[in-house]
Amino acid sequence: MAEVSSKRRKRTKTDIGCQSSAIKKIKEMFDAVMPEDFYDFWAFCEELNPKNPEDALMDTMGLQLVGPYDVLTGKLDGLSESSYHLHWRYYYDPPEFMTVIRGNEDQGFHIGYYRDEPQALPVFVASNKAKVSCEMSVIGENLFSALNTCITENLKKIKDKSQQSSLKKMQTSLITKAKELQYSLATTTPAIKARNKKVNSKTLHKAGIVVPVNAMDVGYRPLTVTDAELKKMLKTITESENKSAKDKASDELQELLTFVQFANDEGDYGMGLELGLDLFCFGSKQFHNTILQLLPLAYQLLGREKYAKIIQEHLENRDREKLSEAS
């Protein structure tokens, strides 16, 4: 989130004392630079629960800080390198998404950063209910706005006066801290709107993809089917008992794969990325081999090698029951 607010906030002593060490360790483990709000949000949670900051939101919101936050708690000490990108990676999480907060286990609710480019700062914070669907909801530009969005939504549903009071108290503290640090609490900001204009396709997960397109309009070409048509095609392949219909749908998918090959030859790498992510979001293991034909290559062609590695690791371990890789 390069554009956190209209004003460049001044660094304060609320930042973690060992932040430089944490930054280095997270970079080594996750190959990612975390935005400032990641550390400031930890400091905010430390104020709420000095002993266990990761559990500061548990009683009121049922949320726990996880993922790279586990570096700060020491939970990832001794973890094998191959496991870092699987740590709290849910079933429908694309490589662009990194979980930092987990919630309702019944629905698989979790919150994380979304990056278009692996080495860039996140473009927004999103949430997903992994046991409900692949769709992601943009809930803010930083973790303060994301939590504020969650609190506001919870206040609409909760009738218990005591719970409402606790939520309002936390929201007041959150708003005060966000204003102090000059973080926007808006769900949609100018930076997010600007990014939306660059989105080539929303994809089935709705967070969208952004790939560079040059002045000659080379870089992306749309799929030749709509989302609805693609889902119908994939559903026919996986569920239909009619062999003729199944074969027809399989031929249609093969045609799409051929179009992607043509697109790659002509520099439109975004088409393979879109189709690969849509197959991933559909969720059937039947398409895992096809996804492996599409996504690693698309990411490599786009210079996003880290994402190629993540999708391969994820598909190999997608059905695992234990999402935490910590011992």
Curated annotation (Swiss-Prot):
Belongs to the HPF1 family. The active site is at residue 266. GO terms for biological process: DNA repair-dependent chromatin remodeling; double-strand break repair. GO terms for molecular function: histone binding; poly-ADP-D-ribose binding. It is found in: Chromosome; Nucleus. Cofactor for serine ADP-ribosylation that confers serine specificity on PARP. Switches the amino acid specificity of PARP from aspartate or glutamate to serine residues. Acts by completing the active site of PARP: forms a composite active site composed of residues from HPF1 and PARP. This is Histone PARylation factor 1. InterPro entries: HPF1 (IPR019361). It comes from Nematostella vectensis (Starlet sea anemone). Pfam families: HPF1. The keyword RNA-binding does not apply. Coiled coil: none annotated. Keywords: Chromosome, Nucleus. GO terms for cellular component: chromosome; nucleus. The keyword Nucleus applies. Its main location: nucleus.
